[in-house]
Regions:
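Glycine-rich phosphate-binding loop at the start of an alpha helix
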Residues: 89-92, 117
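Active-site histidine-anchored catalytic micro-motif
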Residues: 101, 105-141, 145
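Receiver (REC) domain switch/active-site residues of two-component response regulators
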Residues: 148-149
Length: 149
């Protein structure tokens, strides 16, 4: 009986892919708690993909903290410290994998950046539920309005 309930829950929960724009939201000014973030996202379903994208300047301590919270640390290269890097491109390409993955139902982007608007639009065109989590200042209004949640 318990096993049947567990099987039912596993089979009916949506599968979620989470992509975190590290350089954009993991900053001292925002004090992002990855554990709390994961718990909030689990309300949308089972997290099957959880990646935090970082640039090559990310400290070992930060990478360790990300991994200990159950996320994969994905390093993108390029750009100068404190300037634009290829992290956005790397994250967008990975998110597009989820858009075309039939096993993913919900795509969550944690960013403030309007550069990810095409990902949200393409995800919705392909029947995915979309969630954007961000913070002020600088949280793109267009991104917020385009997402389902």
């Amino acid at each position: 009986m318990v096993l049947d309930k567990l099987k039912e829950k596993v089979s009916t929960e949506p599968n979620v892919a989470v992509y975190v724009d590290g350089p954009n939201v993991i900053r001292k000014q925002f004090d992002l708690d990855l554990d709390a973030l994961r718990e909030d996202i689990e309300e949308f379903g089972n997290i099957k993909v959880g990646k935090v994208f970082l640039n090559q300047y990310a400290s070992e301590k930060l990478i360790e903290a990300i991994v200990s919270q159950g996320f994969e640390a994905a390093l993108g290269l390029g750009g100068e410290k404190d300037k634009e890097s290829d992290v956005d491109v790397y994250m967008a390409v990975n998110a597009m994998d989820a858009v075309y993955n039939d096993e993913i139902d919900v795509i969550v982007l944690v960013t403030r950046d309007a550069d990810f608007l095409p990902v949200i639009q393409k995800a919705k065109e392909n029947g995915k539920e979309t969630v954007v989590i961000g913070m002020e200042p600088g949280f793109s209004t267009a991104l917020q309005n385009a997402a389902d949640n």
